[in-house]
């Protein structure tokens, strides 16, 4: 399962990010364009966009974000025939064709998380996700709650949740022999660690994610496919 959450040392804001939202509603024109873009990329690779549901998740669905927080799109497949090989193929596609694109007029980059078969959006809340927007219903699955972004000590589960998702993404790619894509994901995690440490020091989301990947054996698997771990 994949879920991206807030860096808990990001400032707590009075509103959701108004570069991304109109009040508490995601900016429809921008997201409609991006969802159409996802659909076209899927079509080019033999996937039907209508077989999937799409959700806005992560730190931008909370009151705790920064100007560089990712725009996280969780992708849930509705087909029983969607297996781990299909999922790995789709993860590779989003890594190469969708991840890293900027949300218009911001420093926010898109990041896409393809969920395993059988996982629905409600399963993600058990990993620490706090809010999500349903693009199918144009409504909140669970609304943002500013009170949940106040106590830094209680936010640590969000770091671990993000580490779980990075690990899942990397290991899925390794299992599918998509080694270069797995290495690309490592480079993203490494760069994020460096950037977070410059701003926040060792007690930062990027550093905790990096240590999680080391502790749970993901880095050992990356070393086995030739990735140098810094």
Protein language model annotation of sequence segments:
Residues 3-69, 76-230:
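Catalytic core of pol beta-like nucleotidyltransferases
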């Amino acid at each position: 399962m994949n879920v991206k959450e807030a860096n808990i040392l990001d400032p707590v804001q009075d509103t959701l990010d108004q570069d991304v939202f109109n009040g508490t509603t995601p900016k429809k024109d921008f997201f409609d364009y991006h969802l159409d873009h996802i659909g076209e990329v899927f079509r080019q690779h033999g996937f039907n966009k209508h077989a999937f549901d799409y959700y806005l998740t992560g730190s931008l669905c909370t009151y705790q974000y920064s100007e560089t927080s990712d725009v996280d799109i969780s992708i849930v497949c509705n087909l029983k025939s969607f297996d781990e090989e299909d999922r790995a193929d789709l993860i590779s596609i989003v890594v190469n064709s969708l991840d890293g694109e900027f949300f218009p007029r911001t420093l926010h980059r898109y990041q896409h998380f393809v969920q395993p078969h059988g996982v629905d959006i409600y399963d993600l809340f058990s990993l620490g996700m706090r809010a999500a927007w349903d693009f199918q219903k144009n409504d909140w699955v669970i609304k943002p709650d500013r009170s949940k972004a106040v106590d830094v000590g209680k936010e640590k589960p969000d770091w671990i949740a993000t580490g779980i998702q990075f690990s899942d993404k990397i290991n899925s790619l390794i299992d599918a022999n998509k080694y270069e894509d797995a290495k690309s994901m490592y480079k993203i995690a490494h760069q994020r660690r460096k950037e977070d440490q410059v701003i926040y020091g060792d007690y930062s989301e990027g550093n905790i994610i990096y240590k999680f990947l080391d502790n749970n054996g993901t880095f050992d698997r990356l070393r086995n496919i030739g990735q140098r771990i810094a």
